[in-house]
């Protein structure tokens, strides 16, 4: 039995924090897991910036409502789910992901959760056990699944390397250079073909 585990941001949808950075005019918020492997450190830094600027969940959700999946992402996911089981493993948050999952046809997603005060301030976050994606893949394997994984960032490498097949998708030149043994693709058709060949 196979299950395909996909990253979300940068693979199926644009990076939420980059979109919010551009909309809010705060360039520091462009930093993502492509730049900072320590997710706890990255999120605490983001929360400090939000507090400093008086921004909360509503402002972020307003930007997310304008984001569409990457061109071809829904078609890729529909075709993939017609031939095998697939799940999205993301370090994003339920409060961010829901409108994007609707646009992608409601695929299954495992992600984290924000702690939000009554006034909408983001006060903290609850992460699944770290490293989340690797531990989720290992859990699938422990119940009899063969995993195939794809992502674009440092926090995807664990699940990619632990799977029977793993692929980088639209990753950075630095990550591709540092991990030349991981096949890297730029187009959904090529990724889909590689996944189908690994099934």
Segments and roles (model prediction):
Residues 94-98, 156-157, 192:
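Short, well-ordered alpha-helical microsegments
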Residues 2-113, 117-118:
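Alpha-helical substrate-recognition element adjacent to the catalytic core
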Residues 95-147, 178:
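Substrate-recognition "cap/lid" segment bordering the active-site pocket of phosphatases
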Residues 193-199:
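Short amphipathic alpha-helix with an adjacent loop that forms part of the alpha/beta core around
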Residues 78, 138, 157-158:
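Alpha-helical segments flanking ligand/cofactor-binding loops in enzyme cores
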């Amino acid at each position: 039995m196979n299950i395909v585990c996909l990253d979300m941001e940068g693979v199926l949808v644009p990076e939420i924090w980059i979109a919010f950075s551009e909309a809010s005019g705060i360039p520091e918020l462009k930093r993502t897991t492509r730049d900072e492997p320590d997710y706890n450190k990255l999120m605490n830094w983001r929360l400090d910036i939000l507090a400093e600027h008086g921004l909360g969940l509503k402002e972020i959700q307003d930007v997310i409502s304008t984001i569409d999946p990457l061109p071809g992402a829904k078609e890729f996911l529909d075709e993939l789910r017609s031939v095998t089981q697939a799940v999205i493993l993301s370090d994003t948050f339920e409060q961010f992901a829901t409108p994007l999952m609707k646009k992608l046809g409601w695929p299954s997603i495992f992600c984290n959760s924000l702690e939000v005060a009554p006034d909408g301030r983001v006060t903290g976050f609850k992460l699944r056990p770290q490293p989340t994606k690797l531990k989720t893949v290992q859990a699938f394997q422990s119940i009899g699944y063969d995993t195939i994984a794809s992502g674009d960032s440092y926090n995807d490498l664990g699940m990619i390397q632990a799977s029977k097949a793993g692929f980088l998708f639209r990753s950075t030149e630095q990550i591709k250079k540092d991990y030349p043994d991981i096949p890297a693709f730029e187009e959904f058709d090529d990724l889909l073909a590689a996944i189908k060949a690994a099934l």
